Design a protein with these regions (language model features):
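Enzymes that bind and transform nitrogen-containing heteroaromatic metabolites
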Residues: 1-293
């Protein structure tokens, strides 16, 4: 019998060339297309409740939407979700919004986080494909409100890149954040966000980018025609939306015209669903994400 946390995928469309797997007992190989010539291929990675909630405004540090949506840490489904996220961090580099960085003071966007089980095979899988040991950690921040002592900025071997605006660059300087690479552009406009990702590709060699949110960042990328696909884990938790302020929902994928490429679950008794949605090209405005970056 194989590993009970290995997701069994059903493929509806060809996703791209197979990347391979660090351990076939734990992970099925996933495929990715070649990235566009002038920017990274960007895929979102999120967890949502059974009724589509991805986040809400926290009352305090203990009011963690992701932990509540995921449920018991010992469930096989939750372990499978964590392992999928870690696998997706081996594909290329990883990005996250400044709000998430502020809310998670121990977060490091690496295949093995400090509290994880040891997983040297994930790093060997990266290195064998010509990638650096750790993925580059990319932070999106409109205003430069990044904690200077956050481990993304201070962990040896992790190369942080902050994507920000002119105002954000000034705030980073005020906070004496000097060791991170910085890309500056007009991120509140789709064209500025597009230019920033062109620079990620041209100046830093970012070919594949896993964006772990939050939803405001993902929506901005989508509006700028940059978000190519989404990996969505849906749990069995139903969130009472009336009990929270500032509730954020995931995309309505059908309304967005997205195509379901793959769907997975644990067999025989898994309750989470793991879906992979691919977008068509989109356009729009990124202005509404300004308050959280």
């Amino acid at each position: 019998m194989g590993d009970p946390t290995r997701i069994q995928w059903t493929r509806f469309r060809r996703a791209g060339s197979e990347v391979g797997t660090p351990d076939p007992e734990r992970w099925a190989s996933l495929g990715f297309p070649s990235p566009p010539p002038d920017r990274p291929w960007i895929f979102g990675v999120v967890v949502t409740s059974a009724n589509g909630v991805v986040a809400w405004r926290r009352r305090d540090a203990r009011d963690d939407p992701v932990r509540q949506i995921l449920g018991d840490e010992t469930r096989l489904d939750r372990i499978a979700d964590r392992r999928l996220m870690r696998y997706l961090r081996t594909i290329g580099d990883v990005g996250v919004g400044a709000q998430t960085v502020r809310e998670q003071p121990t977060l490091i966007l690496t295949p093995q986080e400090p509290s994880d089980e040891r997983a040297p095979e994930l790093y060997a899988f990266r290195v064998a494909r010509g990638l650096p040991h750790h993925p580059r950690n990319i932070i999106y921040s409109i205003y430069g409100r990044v904690p200077p002592q956050h481990p993304i900025l201070t962990t040896p071997g992790v190369a942080p890149i902050i994507v920000t605006t002119p105002a954000g660059r000034a705030e980073l300087a005020r906070r004496k954040i000097r060791d991170a690479a910085v890309i500056v552009d007009a991120l509140l406009e789709p064209e500025g966000l597009q230019r920033a990702h062109a620079r990620l590709r041209a100046e830093h060699g970012v070919r594949y980018l896993a964006c772990e949110g939050g939803q405001t960042v993902l929506a901005a990328l989508r509006a700028a025609s940059l978000l190519d696909e989404m990996f969505v884990t849906t749990t069995d938790v139903v969130v009472d939306r009336a009990a929270h302020d500032g509730v954020l929902m995931t995309f309505d994928f059908a309304a967005e015209g997205a195509t379901l490429v793959e769907e997975g679950c644990l067999e025989p008794s898994g309750v989470y669903t793991f879906k992979r949605w691919r977008f068509r090209e989109s356009a729009g405005s990124t202005r509404w994400w300004r308050s959280r970056a």
